[in-house]
């Protein structure tokens, strides 16, 4: 993997983080009108249906250019398996996140971003090498998370968010495994259908929201479904093809910074001094993990 492709992947994932950051505000507003599981199920179906024409048009363009290669039965099986696995992990993570988002957009995002710790830890069990600078960046990220959240006793919504960060780490590693093997748009589409089916099935037992309530949070659903799901999660799958899961998770954890900024700009939530410092430290962690190792080695050679 070249430095150019790694940079490309990082930039795509930073854009993903921006889109996700704003989605915390939409989720926070949306769950005021309908149940968290209903919100997550509906937005997932919206994201899935939005991706169908994208997948079709992409294939038609390839056919027209003569670059289309019909997938084998094995590739289709891998795509379906990947979509189901990613969907189950994402369903668990995003549902827990939506259930805990009433902790506030900024706090929710930064607790969720603890997946930057779980990804390299889980990666060790998968025999993935993690550079020392990444562990330093992870520690910086944890310090940033502490500052942004402050000293607090865990509430139920915060427990939901910590659990969701664990499953987001599982989702990132699952995407890392399947994304190089299959079409990214199709993988994203299938995973959202899986999320929608699971959550909407649960919704039938918990209570179906009224049409009026769904319409009242229509704007939040549109952003969360089209932008956060269809666009951002597809960008995640594409971006992770060009970077390691640990570096990718650190780039995506910038969503916490953008969530705080979105809460400030859209909801008028004023940033406290410790929150600003925390944002800066998390951003520094993202930059650190992207610095090539060669820079430090060359500097040491010059000094000697």
Segments predicted by a language model, with ranges:
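Hydrophobic transmembrane alpha-helices of multi-pass small-molecule transport proteins
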Residues: 51, 130-150, 168, 199, ...
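Helix-helix packing/entry segments at the starts of transmembrane helices
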Residues: 42, 108-114, 175-196, 229-265
């Amino acid at each position: 993997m070249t430095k150019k492709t790694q940079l490309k992947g990082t930039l795509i994932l930073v854009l993903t983080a921006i889109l996700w950051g704003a989605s915390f505000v939409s989720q926070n507003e949306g769950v005021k009108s309908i149940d968290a599981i209903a919100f997550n199920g509906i937005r997932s179906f919206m994201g899935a249906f939005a991706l169908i024409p994208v997948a079709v048009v992409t294939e038609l363009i390839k056919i027209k250019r003569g670059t289309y290669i019909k997938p084998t039965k094995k590739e289709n099986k891998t795509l379906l398996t990947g979509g189901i696995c990613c969907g189950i992990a994402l369903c668990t993570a995003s549902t827990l996140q939506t259930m805990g988002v009433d902790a506030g957009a900024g706090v929710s995002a930064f607790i969720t971003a603890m997946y930057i710790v779980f990804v390299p830890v889980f990666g060790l069990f998968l025999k993935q090498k993690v550079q020392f600078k990444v562990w330093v960046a992870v520690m910086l990220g944890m310090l940033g998370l502490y500052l942004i959240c402050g000293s607090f006793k865990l509430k139920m919504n915060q427990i939901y968010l910590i659990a969701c960060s664990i499953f987001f780490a599982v989702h990132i590693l699952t995407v890392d495994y399947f994304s190089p093997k299959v079409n990214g748009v199709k993988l994203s589409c299938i995973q959202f259908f899986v999320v929608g089916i699971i959550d909407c099935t649960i919704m039938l037992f918990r209570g179906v929201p009224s049409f009026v309530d769904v319409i009242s949070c229509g704007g939040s659903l549109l952003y969360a479904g089209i932008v956060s799901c269809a666009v951002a999660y597809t960008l995640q799958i594409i971006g992770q093809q060009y970077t390691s899961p640990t570096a990718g998770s650190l780039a995506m954890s910038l969503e916490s910074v953008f969530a705080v900024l979105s809460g400030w700009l859209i909801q008028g939530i004023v940033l406290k001094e410790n929150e600003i410092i925390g944002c800066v430290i998390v951003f520094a962690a993202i930059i650190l993990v992207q610095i090539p190792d060669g820079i430090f080695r060359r500097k040491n050679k010059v000094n000697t």
